[in-house]
């Protein structure tokens, strides 16, 4: 990032101009590694469009509602409502031992939406259920690290728990 334009882009600041490709590096919260690094530090970060207030998870460099590139990063609440959910019976190999499991699209209290596994049986969940995001260690959850891509090995696992 250039020091005069976006030096504080990772800390809840409004940018002075649209993000450019040179403003993004591997540590930026606008990348998946940066998003998961923040999550590992107990921060759930979303990009928030300064033109239309749309919150995007994981963060994006441009708003997918209005197309603006004027975005900032902000911490998000961990609680939300189940908008949609399904039961996965044939997951990717890293999650094979967990099947069947429930996955949901959750609208957080801020309006941002995030998809994740829910620590509840499919039949126990319903649209409108209140859940809260927790961060867990993938190995402790039974995820095979050999099935992860090399850059994903240290990423924490986000899971929603019913409240």
Predicted regions and their residues:
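A broadly conserved sequence feature marking short terminus-proximal activation segments
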Residues: 1-44, 150-153
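OB-fold/S1-family single-stranded nucleic acid-binding modules
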Residues: 134-163
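Short cysteine-rich clusters marking metal-coordination/redox-active sites
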Residues: 49-52, 63-66
